[in-house]
């Protein structure tokens, strides 16, 4: 606030220095209004009068601790403990602020007079007279009321209206205002509000913690807010703890805890230490068998801890428990016992949070972080029988280890108490470093140094002695070992030896038994967390777990181990897991063991679905069928249930619905239109579909039948997993993590809004939770975009799996063709076409298929579209959606079209489940099927976790095998590798002989797209490597599995994981796929030497003669190339003002290494005196201007920060000519053949359709040139400009095709390293006469205003006169949960690339907005062929078109052109947000949007050298756009800001202050540090070498906010 006020005042002060009285009056009014607003804001805070006299430091303490109040310090009362007494009233007001006004409130031990003065008639105070001090306090409060009334009577005033109800209540019924009973026995008030509250200000100490919850419940208290004094040091063994801020102290004697003030002896309060400790450590306070109060700490202010106790109903805990008994009473009893156990366990776990979590302790006890408790060993010189008191001290852990590590290096002779004390005292005192006195890092009380030194010395001596004894291995000498030990101790302690010996033996640090010696090194310290747990355990007994029953049950399992021991890897068998599964499922362990042995030995005659006999699998296979009789849901029953009609299903609530069993003999799977339709899934209980184990664990029949059964079960498992996930999400939306959030959606029917917004719309089905909290599967219908919900629905959950009826439709289709519950196996001939990579399998399918009678099926949608496109390329439509389909489409829509085909062609069939292939062959009713695939590439992968997919079921049974062993893609060296994988001779047609190479990199840190660009397609083995490369800035990265079947010219294969990866081996199909994707070259980047490197090295060593043997001559082949296309309110946390100039310099050097070392002060001089060769087009040079006139150089301030900034240059012939060549000459010529007029009209049509709101289009009859528009233009001009128009008659115009040329003397800083190798050219200004601007300025200003009014401002922003706050508001409604592609179009040579086409587009836009035809022709004439004259440098030249940098339409024209360019190439109808400013643009599209080739379109149509970048964070006009879950924040580029701080053109201190003010205006958002981590990520995306920069952001804020500190950044 202070910073904003200071910046406002400075801006107003600079404005007031002007001579315009109107501006001065407006500035004065604005200053007055700002001051009034600030005062009103302060006045709205609650007011508290602080009457007691306190010091200035104490005033600051109170103000900082309670910023919620407007505190007025009168200093009219002198009293003891003034600060503590005054803070008590602030604490009471703070507690009352937490309570809704007017709610019935109990003030436990409170001050009823204070509430009466505030007029709180809803507060009841419990003020028991526990001792005489309470009686005195009660009488004092009565006296204060009488004193107040007497003052009112003396002044002849009446009681104010807001106090009168409370005084009336006290007069009529004093017991309703205050009672003298403890809170536990208070009878309360008769009339209460809906919710009752309580406050306890320093009164919890006297209420037993065990009775507190019950007392609150008796008064029906909803929430209780409390405050009490406490100190972490109370957990030490010290008897005295000081509270310095309020001048008080605690003293402890056993369980008696006394509280007193330092300068006051009469106020002494005594409490129970154990009771106070319970309030600190306990989390829950039971009130009844049902209710409990949960404690939560709020804040700590001036030695006072604030917390609240919330009332909770434990009956809302989940009560469900599984029970198999038939006795209802026993069932209900077991349920109650289980629930009470769960309730108690939940509360105990809540209480243990503080005791078990060290981070929680550090949060609530911040002073104790990194502090340890060290014992002190007292040296006694008195008689033996004297008992010594134990003492402990809390010191820094770092200090302890610094001392111990140092003195442990001492030799035996040097290890004395004196040396230890000397070292400890030296590191505690001040030291001198390089002539500068530095304060010690550790603030340890000097009174403790001697005792601490003794502890460190004794600890080290014992530890070294123990090490010596271990080394010597107890060798026998003339003296016994015990004598050696005592000799060493005597030498160390000299005359103190007898007492030290007694101390060591009494403390049991050394145990002596005759000549046996035992040395025990004591614990060095105890952490604060351990002491907290110890103190709490001493008063609260922790529960102990009884494990006897589990041990007895585990013992029974050993009888079954003798049967299992004969199996391989039987030592890895987990007995405990096996025991739990057998007990849960009711399986005899001995029987299970025998079945395992029989199955593994192939003696059982059964095929089990699991791959190996694990503990769970065996128990599941032997589980008996369980029929559930619970009402209210549809249940799955055992296989002996016969066929049921719909009526029977409804009556019995039973259906045999999912899965297949080998012993099914009923007709339950017969085809039935009524049962087999998708409607059977509607409103079916989720428990029916969610299967926690296989419905059939044993498959029988031929292999194809078993494969079909396993495939159907896999579909059921997939549907079960989807429903299970939705059921979990619908009950707990907070459980969705960020990675999976975009896959799910949860709709609240009551609120009519999405709690979790899904990425897509129009889901086919979902999971519904009704008013009874039961979940069902529902087929969704829509009314427009809204879901049609039932009356009892509460929530609807959807996911990416529920977009279509995928698994449901497949299950329906497959079950419709079952015969007697068994799959039908077709008699068609199945031929496997096994082809090597790149053999042309798709081309062969197109050549063999007859689309009139055959069917082509492919796994993916894109592959199907590709085949249809290639088949119809001749113009004749032969391939349709009926004969070329995806596998999913064929299964889900089975029966709705042709069902019989002659031949079936299945592309990439080996990537499908073999059971799916068998079903496809049978359902197509074909006579012959061709399955195309690659037996050596990646096969079908089971995507459902925990679903069993035995290995023997993965083999596809076929009748014939055809091989294709000629690759059209792979080079010769890869063909040599393929011959090692395939049977038969593999040949190639490629002319490339060698294509492989590899490079071992030092680590993942070296991967950077700038320093190490990767050629071609980037492929990784794992998703983690893919994510890492994408985060480093690489684009278009995919895994090996994702690119199977695709072809690329060049491939970069990357491995950044040093740990072993299972899929990287010589036998892995992933290796084969990765090495066979390229046609020209592949390079492998790896951090370790692995199997891939071994293969590549072997291929590099193969002779060229041998590789030529694998080549064959063929005609020109055209291989399909598949290439990827480029596709609220902010939280405010004030930034700490820390850091130094060195921080900013370090950050600049890390981001732009080397720029600060460039000495460019005399580059302009060097340019003048050396010979230069320039490529100049036709121009006229006045060589008399080649030597610039001598001018006195202005003195400037010298910046402290070293950057690449240059001093202002002097205009001259050479300097201006270089700038003209750079900015105006040598314009690019990339455009193709363009029909300018027609194309411009089409582009403008797209521009108006994309950006303008049709309802707001401007009518044609609005005058553009009027007195009002001219006055608006004049108001924006400077006085010097108006003076040039004094003699202008507005009758005739100067030549509109003539422009003046000049340069900007200050070079523009670029945030790259080009300054190290280039001489940057200056920016030019090409401008018209002011007389021309006086005519066209108002016209285009009015056109611009009307254009911006018609723009759809909710989606588009044309950045004209916008503030950073307006930018934040524009982007604030971006949904951070919706994946987006952020695009930036970077155009080089933007101004001089604009030609006749750009002018035509711009003129067409102005004409449609209403520009007069005559003015349009004049303006067009002035921008076709133009003359530039530079009178200062003596240069004259002619230019065609181009954008003039000083024209009246320069900014808006550039903005319009970039917007029109993007609207002509990109699908703007899908755009979420877009912003344009000059040649800058930022676009937000939905993730995955397809984009055309931007570079080609920009070149051929717009003559632009353009590149389209996809970013994670937007960068617009030198600002980072950070969108987050609360909105958006715009940060000014910190590197650009630091670069400006190295400016060398600052003239004087006044100029410097103006410079600081301008920087404050643009960089104000840096004062909010809440999103610094996001800013680090955004900067790291643009500048790869940038370190985390929160330290430099704080330093920038520090210097910009302080006027005097900012002056130190520049020297005279």
Swiss-Prot record:
Annotated region Helicase: the residues are 831-1086
- Which reaction does this enzyme catalyse, per its entry? RNA(n) + a ribonucleoside 5'-triphosphate = RNA(n+1) + diphosphate; ATP + H2O = ADP + phosphate + H(+)
Q: What's known about how it's activated or inhibited?
A: In resistant plants, is bound by host protein Tm-1 (e.g. tomato Tm-1 AC A7M6E7), thereby inhibiting replication complex activity.
Where the record annotates domain (+)RNA virus helicase ATP-binding, the positions are: 803-964
The consequence of residue 976 to Y is:
Increased ability to multiply in tomato plants but reduced infectivity in original host plants (e.g. pepper and tobacco)
Residue stretches making up the (+)RNA virus helicase C-terminal domain: 965-1117
Q: What is its EC number?
A: 2.1.1.-, 2.7.7.-, 2.7.7.48, 3.6.4.13
Q: Which SUPFAM superfamilies match?
A: DNA/RNA polymerases, P-loop containing nucleoside triphosphate hydrolases
Q: Name one GO biological process term.
A: viral RNA genome replication
Q: Name one Pfam family in it.
A: ToMV_Hel_N
> Which GO MF term does the entry hold, naming one?
mRNA methyltransferase activity
**Alphavirus-like MT domain span:** 72-280
The protein's superkingdom reads: Viruses
The keyword Glycosyltransferase belongs to this UniProt entry's keyword annotation:
no
Its quaternary structure? Heterodimer of a large and a small subunit. Both large and small subunits interact, via an ATP bridge, with host protein Tm-1 (e.g. tomato Tm-1 AC A7M6E7 and AC A7M6E8).
Other remarks? This protein is translated as a fusion protein by episodic readthrough of a termination codon. When readthrough of the terminator codon TGA occurs between the codons for Gln-1117 and Gln-1119, this results in the addition of the RdRp region to the replicase.
Family membership: Belongs to the ssRNA positive-strand viruses RNA-directed RNA polymerase family.
Under what name is this protein listed?
A: Replicase large subunit
Q: Which organism is it from?
A: Pepper mild mottle virus (strain Japan)
Q: What is the lineage of its organism?
A: Viruses, Riboviria, Orthornavirae, Kitrinoviricota, Alsuviricetes
